[in-house]
UniProtKB/Swiss-Prot annotation:
Pfam families: Dak1, Dak2. It comes from Pectobacterium atrosepticum (strain SCRI 1043 / ATCC BAA-672). Residues 7-331 form the DhaK domain. This is L-erythrulose kinase. Residues 366-568 form the DhaL domain. Keywords: ATP-binding, Carbohydrate metabolism, Kinase, Nucleotide-binding, Transferase.
Amino acid sequence: MTYLFNQPSSFARELTEGFVAAHADKVRQVPGGVVRSTRSREGGVAIVVGGGSGHYPAFAGLVGQGLAHGAAMGNLFASPSAQQICSVARAAHNGGGVLLTFGNYAGDVLHFGQAKARLNAEGIPCELLAVTDDISSAPLNEWQKRRGVAGDLMVFKAVSAAAEAGYDLAAVLEVAERANQRTRSLGVAFSGCTLPGAEHPLFTVPEGMMAVGMGIHGEPGIRDVPISTADELAELLVSSLLKEVPHGITTLSGQRISVVLNGLGGVKYEELFVVYRRVSQLLVEQGLTVVEPEVGELVTSFNMAGLSLTLFWLDEELERFWRAPADAPAFRKGSMSPGEPLAERTFVAELEVIPNATAASKAAAHCVAAALNAARDIVLANVTELGRIDAIAGDGDHGIGMERGVIAAADKATEMLERQAGAGTLLQRAADAWADQAGGTSGAIWGVALNALGTVLGDEQRPDGRRVADGVRQAKESVMHFGKAKPGDKTLVDALIPFSLALTQRVETGMSLPEAWQQAAQCAQQAADDTAQLLPKIGRARPLAEKSLGTPDAGAISLAMILDAVSAVLNSDTTSTSSHQTATQAESER
């Protein structure tokens, strides 16, 4: 359990504030995360890392000279939003472009991918690299699906040293790709982690057993085996990792590697050293030369009892980068002169301009806000159940993420009503708030979907049924484009597609929007229930697909819940589109 916190909702923000207060000589806080507080080389590439909070020293503790220039920090176990990532990247940018690098998780891929597109559009050259070192999470022929765990550190260190050496963005990206291809990790867990305010851990391990292949967000392992001795565990980890040698290495003898034995938060350093004693012996017996190993907590999983072993297969350049000096709050190598402090900067929130809207669109905005309030109420009533469903094969955080997102969206909608926003603008700003506060995969998906719907609704008129159906179809297409999910993958898409089709078909026959929405929502509910018979093909549940059989997808279920709640709003709205197919010409031109 977590003993010390104020409010669970403020934990991530307050830990960042405390971290910056403790390390002001190395980092400063910016909206969305932290950046170096010391001067970096003008014209150099900026390395921006990031992910959810709860993994310290990753990610903020790895910001400093010789390491990252900035870290985007999401909520606990939730990826930072694209808005947060962009904010950190802009603050870290030195004129030579930005490399975004992070562990390979669906939410991070979505948010960092969107941030890359925004930054490039702004004129800041940007590339990204998702770390894929966890050998338990996918076979070698599907390495792109592997998770990023403690191997994050190896990649972050290599690319940061390359940037310090003056490499340009393309060359830094090449180093990132090579370092990633030469990094392998495997871990075990003895117990799950419990987040602040939670009564139960995200997952449990049967007494006397250990879960092999867990993820750093508490994802269950691929198999449970009896807890072994320290030497037996070392042998399991080393033998598993040596079965998968990077391409181009034909013999172990004479190879140079670096090693990280990483504690996940609940294993004592003394225990780690006992395990490393045997790890070192086994590697030397294979003729390997170990270069500057690290033993300790480097990429944790809050208070999970567990550890992981990472092998970093060096070439001449990667060894030079691994051994290069670094001075970050939680990671130091060699010696560096103190950095030149930067002048204090005050970040002023950007003024949010509200576009003009017609009276008809402003009236419709009240209905949109009511729909978001209804979504909030249904999610809050089902947070625990959504988390339970998600925990069957995932990390169990879906309910918490949806709660954060929908509350932020409903609050933003209220603010937009007070500022006389039209329906489209209100929904788009609510979408941004949802994505920013929820983080994670669900935050990215809902942000993309509601933004697309809001764009189609616009601020010029009261949307009729056809326009709403067009907006839902655009939302579906945007979600599939950014999330890469297809029908049958056991995701929200499996409920969204039938909803969109049913809504379009019914409004095209002349059915009123409230009635069409209600019937389409029923189709979505049935489709969501039917996902129980599917096996997940993407996301964190994929490695444990069989465990999810018989349980519906949490994202599809939450979507169906919200669609049903919105149906009640539409049917109770006396000024709904069913009695107002179009606004008056005077209103639409006002």
